[in-house]
Amino acid sequence: MFSMCKQTHSATAVEFSIACRFFNNLDENLVVAGANVLKVYRIAPNVEASQRQKLNPSEMRLAPKMRLECLATYTLYGNVMSLQCVSLAGAMRDALLISFKDAKLSVLQHDPDTFALKTLSLHYFEEDDIRGGWTGRYFVPTVRVDPDSRCAVMLVYGKRLVVLPFRKDNSLDEIELADVKPIKKAPTAMVSRTPIMASYLIALRDLDEKIDNVLDIQFLHGYYEPTLLILYEPVRTCPGRIKVRSDTCVLVAISLNIQQRVHPIIWTVNSLPFDCLQVYPIQKPIGGCLVMTVNAVIYLNQSVPPYGVSLNSSADNSTAFPLKPQDGVRISLDCANFAFIDVDKLVISLRTGDLYVLTLCVDSMRTVRNFHFHKAAASVLTSCICVLHSEYIFLGSRLGNSLLLHFTEEDQSTVITLDEVEQQSEQQQRNLQDEDQNLEEIFDVDQLEMAPTQAKSRRIEDEELEVYGSGAKASVLQLRKFIFEVCDSLMNVAPINYMCAGERVEFEEDGVTLRPHAESLQDLKIELVAATGHSKNGALSVFVNCINPQIITSFELDGCLDVWTVFDDATKKSSRNDQHDFMLLSQRNSTLVLQTGQEINEIENTGFTVNQPTIFVGNLGQQRFIVQVTTRHVRLLQGTRLIQNVPIDVGSPVVQVSIADPYVCLRVLNGQVITLALRETRGTPRLAINKHTISSSPAVVAISAYKDLSGLFTVKGDDINLTGSSNSAFGHSFGGYMKAEPNMKVEDEEDLLYGDAGSAFKMNSMADLAKQSKQKNSDWWRRLLVQAKPSYWLVVARQSGTLEIYSMPDMKLVYLVNDVGNGSMVLTDAMEFVPISLTTQENSKAGIVQACMPQHANSPLPLELSVIGLGLNGERPLLLVRTRVELLIYQVFRYPKGHLKIRFRKMDQLNLLDQQPTHIDLDENDEQEEIESYQMQPKYVQKLRPFANVGGLSGVMVCGVNPCFVFLTFRGELRIHRLLGNGDVRSFAAFNNVNIPNGFLYFDTTYELKISVLPSYLSYDSVWPVRKVPLRCTPRQLVYHRENRVYCLITQTEEPMTKYYRFNGEDKELSEESRGERFIYPIGSQFEMVLISPETWEIVPDASITFEPWEHVTAFKIVKLSYEGTRSGLKEYLCIGTNFNYSEDITSRGNIHIYDIIEVVPEPGKPMTKFKIKEIFKKEQKGPVSAISDVLGFLVTGLGQKIYIWQLRDGDLIGVAFIDTNIYVHQIITVKSLIFIADVYKSISLLRFQEEYRTLSLASRDFNPLEVYGIEFMVDNSNLGFLVTDAERNIIVYMYQPEARESLGGQKLLRKADYHLGQVVNTMFRVQCHQKGLHQRQPFLYENKHFVVYGTLDGALGYCLPLPEKVYRRFLMLQNVLLSYQEHLCGLNPKEYRTLKSSKKQGINPSRCIIDGDLIWSYRLMANSERNEVAKKIGTRTEEILGDLLEIERLASVF
């Protein structure tokens, strides 16, 4: 069985985050990684353009509200295991160090020339002698970097340290000279100067023979040589054995002398508590480190005695280490994350989501004398924490949305003496209890998503520093207050615990929900619903991968080819200046003018011309005027009054118009470009033709005028910092923090520098030190607020395939790209090194343009261009180039060399292979063409339609056969969403009206004008449009009940419990434990089943089932069982299997519950109460009910290792057959009479049920051990495969082939294909392949095939699809060529990544046979010439491959 695996929704979980200067040394960026995705964000002001004009950045004291903006995304062929950054000697930016399993390390850096990641060095330590006999893949390769950037270390296989030394920056002069002079030395001389020196290995046993089971490694601050702390446990223990062996952890500090390669141990601490988790170094001037254990915090320093506190009463019994109980605190640091926000303060995020601020109270000797804990907020469950710009904190999460918080420290400067401390702290404790109640409500993450502003300026922390001194002395304390405020959140749909497909709810024209009964399964519109998140971050996520617009109304207009909407004179309107007033429809020979208000009416006798076809209509002069362009005229109107009519008489019709207010650019059929500008002299507006023109040969085939607000399009070099904004204002004052403090006199300043008088400015506390460093960093957001002056540019494409950029109005050529239709990854200026004098008018025609003919003969010609500023306030310009085969989407990035300081980097490429060819046939009769050319022709209708506000979003609509929306929001990520169905959109316009707010209108193939809105409940700034319904508890299993069209969901809530059952034989008694105030009680789970209606996505009231305490739901399915009394029909029932988890001493027992959902008359005013749940059967079983399914109308249950078949009769279950299997069956699926079961440890088995004999028998099984997570059938016409996902993140396909010799006569299932996915899959379902689309390929190759959709615990979605053999062979050859053809990011080989991974040595080779869809799809993004070369190598045509890809894309876009 040949198949392909492709990921369609990338992972959204965040596991690692660091702050680093990724693009340049001025700006700090946030780099996050999760699974195999790496993203780079910047913190940017969230200020609209209208507000920004009123702000003066230099006068603002406080930073505005901030947002996270994604600047780069990289998908890797390997999961990130550890992420760090380092500043290398003489580098313009930081380098990233990323480790991968089992022992790979890549050093990477941003490449400013191509806006890509370049690999600086690769380090590989997976040889067998380094492995030391280990076959398991248990060890995480942890990377740590010395704070002074002298070296980095990586722990491999838990037994060895890799040391990566960095060269010191000795001579700055040499580096500066090297930038200027060409290097003529031999390559060997170059190698010796690289910033990264040769790496080497240290075996930990050589340092100390006891070092084993390493828990954490960290570098200490402030040592002359790099000093590494290693926390390890030489002899392991566990909580059940601490009476025998406790305090097993040891901390050693090793000094790394890199030159001599000697590594003495300089400091050892023995007998640390057995539950040590991590160690955190503390910066100078305090120094030392904090050791975090599950129940305690310990401060260690080489020169002072240790100081530790216990955080709960468990620490008192589990360790002999001297710990002082911490008053008022009862927490556990298990699964907690930590980050220093100051030298003496760190934020702790607990596994419950609570945020605490821990202050180290330091005495005058810089020794930690006390800890002060303070509960600051309740937030998301974090996986990592990172501090940015010293006042922002990023909480990365795998289980909920990641958050960006802003924290500010207010200084009340209240001076109090030690006597007041006691009363103060008591009073504060009372205040805090009240405050905590409010905080729990404010800071819970899902409410933040809905109303982040509520959380503004809440008082979070009001804390005093406790100072221990002699009682007589009055020590001075300062009260400090922290304010936390949520700025932004990143959507995350991980982990996908369970998912299913359900029917989509349709909306009728009047907004009523409509549930059409599909004629056939092929017409069924389905959506993907997933149970995502955990605990209070739990949610139901509804995914759609095609937008289904809500059609408000539609009417038929025969012969209309194009549509526009425009505004009336903005000065006449008082408030509603953003609503469209006129709609113009162009027909082949005429134009319709409609006025749009409460109603849409045709108007006549206006200044608009109606007896000619309109080419374009738009607004000019800040929406005060309207310009209408026909094939022969340009008309300027104010409202409906004609002001000016400019005839265009150049012997050829106008075919394309582009506007950048106040410029109007026209393209004439014969290749000329005419530009007009709006001038208002003495109050009379008129359009003036620009006397500057551009050459008309080779003929211009596409134009786009662009008004730049981003400041990227500039030819000046002096106003360029290396930042993303142009700023002459702040370029000079970037060293602003060197200015005198306002409260210092000048003479004091000199004393401070040179004399003793400086002692007047001694620091009060550690915090004052940090305050000064904070002030110096406050320039960064001011730079981002400076507004760039608008500039105007004309982008044209010529018949020769070149793309040219001209500055307006002087029409000077500033940028020239050869062969733009080739679609190179980076577009560069061919004139970068041409003297500017050549770009004058005379020389440009002959000299440059002739020399720039396309290099590649087969490059498709550009047919249409669009340059549009997307993102917030148009700060992210995109270039869209449409050719016959595809749409190329480029982003603009700053490039300081060259004339115009930009380059273009390809972001994505859309396959438009189905579009009808639009080139002109040359064999037509010339006279006929002359008459027709002045009429409106469909081939000239623009396919790229920019819009400013559709549902609050701006972007581009790509019309045609595969219509789709292209969005790039303020979050900075490109989103492409297709329209559902196989409709062809002819033309499109945004439409804002009283009745249709922020909607749009479009023509489909039937000449129907559809007025629609985007459904507002979906979030479009996501890989797939998604709706997240918060549940505030963990969602477990989820099923769709098709008869009643309702979702059934199992939820789990957790709360501490003080009671438990004591068992005496069969009797059980409930006993209550009381362990004191500081004891942390265990967590108990309460399960419940609820119904959720897909019309409102609310829980149906009074239709839930609450299970008993201690009863866990282990299996849940909708089963089709035979009706009572009638043998023919089957009815859907809800079947739930449970298990009572009491303790390890009691045999597990469970219940089988069977329920029916019945419809009743809803209560008045409560339409949701139409469902009730009726219990059919409930009975205790002799074991845990671990899996459920149905076969031929019978019920199949797995009770641990036994499989039972039951018949439902008279409200009771009657046993029919049973069989014993391996260890513990946790999943059962059936098809016809075959039962496919998954064992938790012993792989899979195939059973057969024979109804006439009432027997259940084992047909075949896999003999190798395998920890199975999920199973599903692979249906390929008449072939049946068994798809399995396992604990090692692989996908394996088995088949039953009794004729094959190696199957031992059918006893053994054969492994036919395997593939390493790299993410854990727990849930899958099947969908039948349907042929959708206008131009259907014959024959349809995917008849009777099913594809399997999977969801991962990292928030990714994908599918496995059986391929026809012909397509598989073509893809396999393509895959083999691409493996060596493309450069490997981070040095990771896709083939190695996709090879089956196993920790046990098995005597079988990898089967492969599954195509890597992600690698195949990368073929689309290659340049046209490269694609042709690759296709030639495998003996096929590019169109064949692109056709296959398009067909598979169509099959998969059913949601």
From Swiss-Prot:
Q: Where in the cell is it found?
A: Nucleus
InterPro entries named in the record: Beta-prop_RSE1/DDB1/CPSF1_1st (IPR018846), Cleavage/polyA-sp_fac_asu_C (IPR004871), RSE1/DDB1/CFT1/CPSF1 (IPR050358), WD40/YVTN_repeat-like_dom_sf (IPR015943)
For this chain, the annotated S-S bridges are none
Principal location: nucleus
Q: Does the keyword Ribosomal protein apply?
A: no
> Which PANTHER family does the record associate with it?
DNA REPAIR/RNA PROCESSING CPSF FAMILY
Q: What is this protein called?
A: Cleavage and polyadenylation specificity factor subunit 1
